[in-house]
Amino acid sequence: MAPCMLLLLLAAALAPTQTRAGPHSLRYFHTAVSRPGLGKPRFISVGYVDDTQFVRFDSDAENPRYEPRVRWMEQVEPEYWERNTQIAKGNEQIFRVNLRTALRYYNQSAGGSHTFQRMYGCEVGSDWRLLRGYEQYAYDGCDYIALNEDLKTWTAADMAALITKHKWEQAGDAERDRAYLEGTCVEWLRRYLQLGNATLPRTDSPKAHVTRHSRPEDKVTLRCWALGFYPADITLTWQLNGEELTQDMELVETRPAGDGTFQKWASVVVPLGKEQYYTCHVYHQGLPEPLTLRWEPPPSTVSNTVIIAVLVVLGAAIVTGAVVAFVMKMRRRNTGGKGGDYALAPGSQTSDLSLPDCKVMVHDPHSLA
């Protein structure tokens, strides 16, 4: 594996609802960060349905609890939150042990700050068959161990992870993971999609434009922006006379805009005076047809000050999105997508939904020890 930065069952009376055709995914991200001299490690857990964060737990909160991040989850009965809060607190203890174990495996001192992360979940197609299951761990921003696509074997990233691999193989942990990913995870994904049906199926088409930036040696940079789109999957390409410039294009990862939508840009360096020969093409499921854009010289009445102000605002939005970059990067690596912050959806129901007792909603992490 290449190193990477990991920077409800509805009440029976509720009628079935339609959801946007797949694929759909349910993923959870756990992060523990040690901070010597400042108390216990901080533990954060977030859950995503597709590109929307819907639950969160933070051990540093005044009253650490599993909490909803979208309005449609506020319909769920209190028992659900109590049960998941206890699960999250148990996971927090396992992650603290794993941090100490990793220090020993890597022969590191306890004086520095370290991170231990986990991502797990499932992705299904439009027929609700499992496309991919995930169970991955990282230490200090690099891959540690991961369940392979066959959901039967593990890949260890280094010699320390081999110790863990042998222990988990002997314990048969992959079988338990596979049962969760193929069964429980898919079922809960279906339930969450039903709960969020009014908002999760939405598509927001991108607003796109091209900016021009001066460079030395008679060159300019053309940057194609796509803003305000959802879901996160999008493709930006530059073409010269109809030929794609894949090798010469700079492309950033899709980033959350902070309002429940996403943003992305792609740029090329072109000869001064040849800007009109280059076209940007934007492909997104929210568009009836792909967009084709060229750089348009601004009217003479537009001052440089106004242009600079616009770019400053766009830059600030990008910085805001970087706060959750590791989640988006994991998503891009595992699904081929390029993906947020998360919009609070208008709730169509105000009463609590009664959820039948379900023993497993989230999946306990493994201990390295």
Curated annotation (Swiss-Prot):
Ig-like C1-type domain boundaries: 206-294
Pfam families: C1-set, MHC_I, MHC_I_C
Molecular function terms from GO: peptide antigen binding
Cross-referenced InterPro entries: Ig-like_dom, Ig-like_dom_sf, Ig-like_fold, Ig/MHC_CS, Ig_C1-set, MHC_class-I_related, MHC_I-like_Ag-recog, MHC_I-like_Ag-recog_sf
Region annotated Alpha-3, chain positions: 204-295
Primary location: membrane
BP GO annotations: antigen processing and presentation of endogenous peptide antigen via MHC class I via ER pathway, TAP-dependent; antigen processing and presentation of exogenous peptide antigen via MHC class I; defense response to bacterium; inner ear development; negative regulation of neuron projection development; positive regulation of T cell mediated cytotoxicity; T cell mediated cytotoxicity
Region annotation Alpha-1: where it falls in the sequence: 22-111
SS bond list: 122-185, 224-280
Domain of life of the source: Eukaryota
Location of the region described as Alpha-2 in the Swiss-Prot/TrEMBL record: 112-203
Intervals, Cytoplasmic compartment: 329-369
Topology term for the membrane: Single-pass type I membrane protein
Extracellular side: 22-305
Phosphoserine PTM sites in chain numbering: 351, 354
Parts of the chain that traverse the membrane: 306-328
Location of the protein in the cell: Membrane
Gene3D superfamilies: Immunoglobulins, MHC class I-like antigen recognition-like
Hydrolase in keyword set: no
GO CC field: external side of plasma membrane; lumenal side of endoplasmic reticulum membrane; MHC class I protein complex; phagocytic vesicle membrane
Stretches the record annotates as Connecting peptide: 296-305
Signal sequence range: 1-21
Function, in words: Involved in the presentation of foreign antigens to the immune system.
Subunit structure and binding partners: Heterodimer of an alpha chain and a beta chain (beta-2-microglobulin).
Family: Belongs to the MHC class I family.
Designated name of the protein: H-2 class I histocompatibility antigen, K-K alpha chain
